[in-house]
């Protein structure tokens, strides 16, 4: 089971003084990311009206080409995983922005957050070896969603067939056994050493 919290807080490590605290419901411990003087995390306190707004926002992104839909789009509203994405100022705890977002397919109870170069990644913390389902292409529902950290607006969201939790190195996301571009989510290619064809970059 996922570990959930009801507060995010900061202490002065020099004297133990509580600097600030932010209350919330259903904050996954694995959703916290700190970078560039900001704290990012998820909350599970979205109202019905906000769920509708999040669904409409996804449809607009689908129409705009930034969100690649998959079978999770056929789920009912109650089955969809809509969370509140929150950005705080690390020094003061002041809220900079928050927005409800449909993160269906990004991991559910295993949903984690990472930061790199002004981008927030949402993905599943999977740590199993699903070679059989992977080889059959049955892990496509494992989605990665990337938001701009400054505003929370969507950069891209795609269902990617990956086995384990992604790792970011520079401008590349390693999604076992492939890798994709951090800025676009496009699977990177290489030249096959024997055939000379352009194929997906893969490792065993």
Task: Describe the residue ranges of each PLM region.
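Secretory-pathway ectodomains
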Residues: 1-204
């Amino acid at each position: 089971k996922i570990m959930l919290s009801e507060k995010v807080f900061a202490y002065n490590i020099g004297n133990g003084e509580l600097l600030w605290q932010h209350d919330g419901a259903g904050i996954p411990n694995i959703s916290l990311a700190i970078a560039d003087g900001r704290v990012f995390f998820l909350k599970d306190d979205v109202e019905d009206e906000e769920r509708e707004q999040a669904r409409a926002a996804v449809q607009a992104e689908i129409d705009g080409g930034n969100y690649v839909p998959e079978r999770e789009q056929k789920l009912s509203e109650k089955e969809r995983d809509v969370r509140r994405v929150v950005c705080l100022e690390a020094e003061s705890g002041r809220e900079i922005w928050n927005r409800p977002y449909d993160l269906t397919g990004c991991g559910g109870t295993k949903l984690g957050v990472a930061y790199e170069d002004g981008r927030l990644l949402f993905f599943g913390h999977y740590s199993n070896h699903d070679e059989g389902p992977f080889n059959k292409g049955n892990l496509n529902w494992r989605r990665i969603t990337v938001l701009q950290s400054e505003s929370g607006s969507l950069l891209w969201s795609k269902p990617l067939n990956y086995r384990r939790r992604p790792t970011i190195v520079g401008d590349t996301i390693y999604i076992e056994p492939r890798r994709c571009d951090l800025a676009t989510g496009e699977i990177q290619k290489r030249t096959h050493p024997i055939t000379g064809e352009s194929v997906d970059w893969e490792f065993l």
